[in-house]
UniProtKB/Swiss-Prot annotation:
This is Pre-mRNA-splicing factor slt-11. The keyword Ribosomal protein does not apply. Its main location: nucleus. GO terms for molecular function: pre-mRNA binding; U6 snRNA binding. Belongs to the SLT11 family. Residues 157-233, 320-370 are annotated as: Disordered. Pfam families: RRM_1, STL11_N. The lineage of its organism: Eukaryota, Fungi, Dikarya, Ascomycota, Pezizomycotina. Associated with the spliceosome. It is found in: Nucleus. InterPro entries: Cwc2/Slt11 (IPR039171), Nucleotide-bd_a/b_plait_sf (IPR012677), RBD_domain_sf (IPR035979), RRM_dom (IPR000504), Slt11_RRM (IPR034356), STL11/RBM22-like_N (IPR048995).
Length: 385
């Protein structure tokens, strides 16, 4: 008769559960969540006991995974989420919560004592003799402090009020600017046309760009935006705007914040490689409002963009020349100024006068070269005097 396998006393203290305890922020928007369960998949970060690990897809678009990091017993004792380890009531880190409520007690430090402490509390929770932290013992001032910390928002510097042309309004730095909170377009490029940043010619040269912005010698500049860019098309099913001129450091969330002010966005497809994006609205009215407000151009975080109606299509099939043209298309919507010496800021208005005006300016700025030898110094010794 083969010898019987003895019961492992250490394994008897390991935790095995059928459902996690997580907060709503860690769960996806889809109510039907598919979770993967792994018995004794990892060790708890607090009590170091093996526990049942649950993992699920947090974002369907990016296939990002989330998982539980502490066991269910420690989560119940700390009243925290198993995934983000934040307090379930206030949404704060448990260290800040315990410091404010003065609930910090010296716990076991060694690994074996942590396991013993967790096993005893697990048995007490099952019998109903123990539970979460006793919040009722904390005074009302500490609880009010936690409420203020949970409701706190990041501080943003209020910008000055600007008009439609980007000029500061008189008196905006006084009471008027503080009363209205400033214009969110300043600095962030949200809600209106803001200042356009200059192009770094040295960085472009280091990246291997051709002189003159990389345009081919025989390529004609793109025309400025016209009524055909912002007038709604006859096809009522078109509810998308084509945005070009997106630079590499312009994040997607700033583009979304800019265009969601006109209506609810169904989807936003941004391709930094192609320097273009498609903004798909849920309603035709929102798309028409955004197109009429932009008038074929927009400035987001100092990045000039061209906005026009279009039908959604694939953005990853462009070649190198087409991608470069998409990048230049944004600045061509605002007109380009001639650079003399260093960098020059590009204004928000179109260049007037066309090619004839540019030729006149070039002709007036021409200087006649001096004859050869005029700059040589005439010494008396060379003349024989």
């Amino acid at each position: 008769m083969p010898p019987q396998i003895k019961h492992d006393l250490n394994r008897s203290g390991w935790e095995a559960t059928d459902f996690p305890s997580v907060c709503e922020n860690c769960l996806p928007e889809n109510p039907y969540v598919k979770m993967l369960k792994e018995d004794y998949g990892a060790e708890c970060k607090l009590c170091t006991r093996p526990f049942t690990v649950f993992s699920w897809a947090a974002d369907r678009a990016h296939a990002r995974k989330k998982r539980t990091n502490i066991c269910l017993t420690c989560a119940r004792l700390k009243n925290a989420c198993q995934c983000c380890i934040l307090d379930l009531q206030f949404g704060l880190p448990i260290i800040i919560r315990d410091k404010a409520l003065e609930l910090v007690a010296p716990g076991p430090q060694s690994e074996i004592n942590r396991e013993y402490f967790a096993q005893n509390n697990e048995r007490a929770i099952e019998e109903g003799r123990a539970g979460v932290e006793e919040y009722e013992k904390a005074d009302e001032k500490a609880r009010e402090l936690l409420r203020r910390l949970a409701q706190s928002k990041p501080y943003f510097r209020k910008g000055r009020e600007v008009d439609e042309e980007g000029n500061p309004v008189n008196g905006s730095s006084s009471g008027a600017g503080r009363a209205t909170g400033g214009n969110p377009a300043v600095g962030a490029g949200v809600g209106g046309v803001g200042p356009i940043r200059t192009r770094d010619s040295r960085a472009a040269a280091a990246a291997g760009a051709r002189p003159g912005g990389g345009r081919r010698p025989n390529a004609a500049p793109a025309p400025p935006p016209g009524p055909k860019d912002w007038l709604p098309p006859a096809d009522k099913s078109i509810m998308s705007l084509f945005v070009t001129g997106i630079e590499d450091d312009l994040p997607e969330f700033k583009i979304r914040d800019f265009f969601k002010a006109f209506g609810k966005i169904k989807s936003l497809v941004v391709s930094h490689m192609s320097h273009a994006a498609f903004v798909n609205y849920e309603t035709r009215e929102a798309a028409e409002k955004a197109s009429a407000e932009c008038k074929g151009r927009a400035v987001i975080a100092g990045c000039p963009l061209r906005v026009r109606w279009s039908v959604p299509k694939a953005l990853g099939t462009m070649n190198k020349e087409q991608r470069s043209e998409m990048l230049r298309d944004g600045r061509s919507a605002f007109g380009s100024g001639q650079k003399t010496g260093g960098q020059k800021a590009i204004g928000g208005q179109n260049a007037q006068g066309g090619a004839s005006g540019a030729q006149k300016d070039d002709a007036s700025n021409l200087t006649i070269a001096a004859p050869p030898g005029a700059a040589d110094v005439q010494y008396a010794s060379l003349s024989g005097n």
